[in-house]
Regions:
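Long, compositionally biased stretches
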Residues: 2-120, 127-133
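Extracellular/luminal Pro/Thr/Ser-rich low-complexity repeat and linker "mucin-like" segments
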Residues: 15-34, 183, 258-259, 263-267, ...
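Cys-dependent protein tyrosine phosphatase-like superfamily
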Residues: 115-275, 288-390
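The Walker A (P-loop) glycine that initiates the GxxxxGKT/S ATP-binding motif of P-loop NTPases
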Residues: 277-279
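Ser/Thr-glycine-rich phosphate-binding loops at phosphate-binding pockets of nucleotides
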Residues: 281, 285-286
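Extracellular Ser/Thr-rich, low-complexity/disordered mucin-like segments
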Residues: 385-401
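A cross-kingdom C-terminal cell-surface attachment/processing module
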Residues: 396-412
Length: 412
């Protein structure tokens, strides 16, 4: 995420590396990734760094020791890194950036503040006291010091359908029904973008949406303007249905993410239908939101982890039971939900309570949570009349149903 082609101003030969400004999608991405004017090939060539090295980075009054990796997913959730992307041949490409996995580097390290407009477009302003360009220095801390973790996180995928002969078209698009405990039958689906052609999967996903009868969609990745600009958008099944466009980043603790997610959950609560949650890959933002909804509806710990990890099989062939599988789960969805729910051991937590408390904390009311659960297939238990109590007909049933629905917002 946050990948782009940047063309910074022509660099002077003074040997300095800088973050040149605040321009959106040149120096700063919507996720808070920060680009420098150092070419990746120079970083690896002239400066002598390599993937798997630990490097000391200095800027402003900050000193960090960061691993050099090809993408944010090579570090645990919440951890920063130096990003040097790989091209199709495995060579360094583009410009050196810094990012936090599921976080916002620019704001965390007080470089810039993000602002979001009502139409979900965004822009950056300098942090108080910061002027641009900002000089950055890189110095080797430990050659190969991150290599063990690097190998564990090393994941390879392609966007070529022919490379995934064992997957159905829907699986290739990372599209699937969520069928965890408590979830209604064929009510909620998740996956990659049905409109963004970047991954070569959008047409497969759009076809899967149609087959599933999806008609209420939460788009975590785009603004409406951005979505409608994709080639062929108007001809998609997707475009003819109810969609909320949230254009969210990946810092799940950020107020703007939580505000946007609350809007998305209210949208689901207010619109009955067959639901779809997606971002770009259907991996991080959609992975978190899907897990949250699974927990809300009564899923077990094992179910939540297993559903999240299906994505890593669909894209990367990561098999359950392997060290890589466990490392990815522990450093991503388990850690993310522990932070969201404020618990130390997710496997021992009351996941439904955690989800409800989280939703209340980001602004949902008990009534909205109840509506959301009912729309996702929650059926309130109807208690049988006791022998000592005369049958009360419809009125009695109404009492029991009422108690069941009232309990939704509590500890059901």
């Amino acid at each position: 995420q946050g990948r782009m082609t940047i063309i910074p101003p022509e660099k002077t030969d003074d040997g300095k590396i800088t973050i040149g400004g605040l321009d959106a999608n040149i120096w700063m991405t919507k996720y808070g990734n920060v680009y420098t004017d150092c070419k990746a090939e120079d970083f690896m060539g002239k400066l002598g760094f390599a993937w798997g090295d630990l490097v000391t980075v200095k800027f402003l009054d900050k000193t960090l020791t960061l691993p050099v990796v090809p993408t944010y997913s090579y570090v645990d959730s919440g951890k920063p890194a130096i990003i040097v992307e790989k091209d199709a041949d495995g060579k360094p490409t583009g410009y050196v950036s810094m990012a936090i996995n599921m976080g916002n580097f620019a704001e965390t390290y007080e470089l810039a503040k993000k602002h979001t407009n009502e139409d979900k477009t965004w822009y950056w302003t300098a942090w108080e006291g910061v002027t641009y360009p900002v000089e950055v220095t890189f110095k080797m801390a430990e050659k190969g010091g991150y290599m063990a973790e690097y190998i564990m996180h090393d994941l390879q995928r392609t966007n070529d359908r022919a490379d995934y002969p064992n997957l159905s078209d829907a699986e290739f698009g990372n599209f699937r029904n969520i069928a965890t405990t408590g979830m209604g039958k064929d009510v909620l689906y998740r996956g990659s973008s049905p409109i963004n052609p970047e991954l070569g999967r959008n047409t497969y996903v759009d076809a899967a949406l149609k087959q599933a009868g999806v008609n209420v969609i939460m788009n975590l990745a785009n603004s409406q303007e951005e979505a409608e600009a994709y080639e062929g958008f108007a001809d998609t099944y997707y475009s003819g249905h109810k969609v909320i466009y949230l254009n969210l980043g990946v810092d799940f603790s950020a107020p703007e993410f939580q505000k946007g997610l609350a809007e998305g959950l209210r949208f689901f609560a207010a619109n009955k239908g067959t639901y779809y949650v997606h971002c770009t890959e259907g991996k991080d933002r959609a992975g978190f939101v899907s897990a949250l909804l699974e927990c809300l509806m009564g899923a077990t710990y094992d179910e939540v982890v297993a559903d999240y990890m299906v994505t890593y099989y669909n894209y990367y062939g990561v098999e359950p039971g392997t060290d890589k599988y466990n490392a990815i789960a522990n450093s991503n969805i388990i850690k993310t939900l522990q932070n969201a729910f404020g618990v130390e051991d997710l496997s021992k937590a009351d996941l439904q309570k955690g989800a409800k408390d989280y939703m209340k904390a980001i602004g949902l009311t008990d009534a909205e949570i109840t509506d959301l659960m009912v729309n996702l297939g929650y059926v309130a238990p109807v208690e049988p009349a006791t022998p000592s109590k005369p049958a009360t007909g419809d009125a009695g049933i109404v009492v029991y149903l009422g108690l069941g629905v009232m309990a939704l917002a509590g500890g059901v």
